[in-house]
Swiss-Prot record:
It is found in: Cytoplasm. The lineage of its organism: Bacteria, Pseudomonadati, Pseudomonadota, Alphaproteobacteria, Hyphomicrobiales. It is an enzyme of class 2 (transferase). Pathway: Cofactor biosynthesis; pyridoxine 5'-phosphate biosynthesis; pyridoxine 5'-phosphate from D-erythrose 4-phosphate: step 5/5. This is Pyridoxine 5'-phosphate synthase. HAMAP family: PdxJ. Keywords: Cytoplasm, Pyridoxine biosynthesis, Transferase. 1-deoxy-D-xylulose 5-phosphate binds at R46, H51, T106. The keyword Plastid does not apply. Belongs to the PNP synthase family.
Amino acid sequence: MPAKLSVNLNAIAMLRNRRDLPWPSVTGLGRAALAAGAAGLTVHPRPDQRHIRFSDLGDIRALIDDEYPQAEFNIEGFPSEAFLDLVEKHEPEQVTLVPDDPMQATSDHGWDFMSKADFLAPIVARLKGRGMRVSLFADPDSLGYERAKAIGADRVELYTGPYGATHDDPAAAARELDRLEKAARAATALGLAVNAGHDLTVDNLPALVKRIPQLAEVSIGHGLTADALMYGIPVTVSRYITALAG
């Protein structure tokens, strides 16, 4: 089964927030993505609400519950108490925990599982106790994956930023694919499902899914939104689903 596509709405929200206006509509374009075949919607709410606003979460939750109950809501972020309160209020199917400073521009590294296991363990238990699947953002080096499994994570999301950055360097892309494949195999051997995200496009997805056929889900926002400016959401989502099929 091809990996599922979760459309990250942050870039749409950032465009909306350039003006004090309700468009482009985050939920409206999320609806269009789901109608076109996306399996879910992802958001990364940050403390300053510079893209996704806290008020968006209830609207997205209602959209999925009322119109696309088979779809999944994925909320990602650093597990501060404020973030955990938001997550518990809106009950996403999946929570992706990332280690970044809430004020940085974007996630750019995975957890240090060896040093952060004691910090993460009670948080993972808390979320799973509420029925949420937990994915941990991970560098593609397999270091500490056994600790991620031991503290109860269901999945790891492989950080694919370095792979995305090799768009004009085939040799470097091959090296990054080797790293990602090795990391995915290590995670799978431990019983962790594998997600991936960051700078994925219709051009680099086919090679990735060929090397990681067990990939469960990709979360894509920036590249997909850029393509949607040219082709529209329905066509763009269809193109990404085709790319995921290899």
